[in-house]
């Protein structure tokens, strides 16, 4: 009688949410997936899908979430725009937490998948450049800052020029440094 009762779907969702609150993510993921598969199309299934999305974003596994959603035939799923946002937000969260290696990897995935033309291309390029800078991977940082410096009117253009100039000067590439210093004057 339990699986067919009118409160079973709600209980399954609540159990998944409890696991999530306890940070038992593997149990939460398993429970949410069971809720989605058992009660497909229900409000609880959609809530479980939202909770899964949040777990995968928080744990920097958004590609795994996207792959999972592609296996679901009977539910309205993510569009390319929401994939764009999910990958960006996941990388941004890693950046804000100071996890620059993970942020750089996430933003690089975003840039390769959605740019040019993605909603967050300029911001993703900026955060990628700063992540590489924080990791002291200066050649990769210069590459990203250069991409920013070439986009007229973006809010990061001056900072990108300054970073390129400073890094080039430190590398004794004085002509490049002078060029970017002059662009700012």
Short names for language-model regions:
Residues 1-185:
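Acidic, polar-rich low-complexity tracts and alpha-helical solenoid repeat scaffolds
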């Amino acid at each position: 009688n339990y699986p067919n009762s009118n409160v079973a779907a709600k209980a399954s969702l609540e159990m998944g949410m409890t696991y999530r609150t306890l940070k038992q993510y593997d149990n939460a993921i398993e429970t949410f997936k069971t809720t989605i598969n058992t009660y497909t199309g229900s409000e609880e299934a959609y809530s479980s899908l939202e909770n899964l999305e949040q777990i995968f974003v928080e744990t920097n596994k958004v590609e795994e979430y996207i792959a999972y959603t592609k296996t679901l035939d009977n539910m309205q799923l993510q569009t390319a725009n929401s994939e764009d946002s999910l990958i960006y937000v996941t990388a941004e969260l890693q950046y804000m937490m100071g996890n620059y290696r993970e942020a750089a990897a996430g933003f690089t995935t975003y840039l390769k998948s959605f740019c040019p033309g993605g909603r967050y291309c300029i911001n993703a390029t900026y955060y990628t450049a700063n992540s590489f800078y924080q990791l002291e991977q200066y050649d990769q940082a210069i590459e990203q800052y250069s991409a920013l410096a070439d986009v007229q009117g973006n809010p990061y253009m001056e900072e990108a020029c300054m970073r390129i100039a400073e890094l080039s000067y430190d590398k004794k590439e004085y002509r490049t440094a002078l060029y970017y210093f002059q662009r700012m004057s």
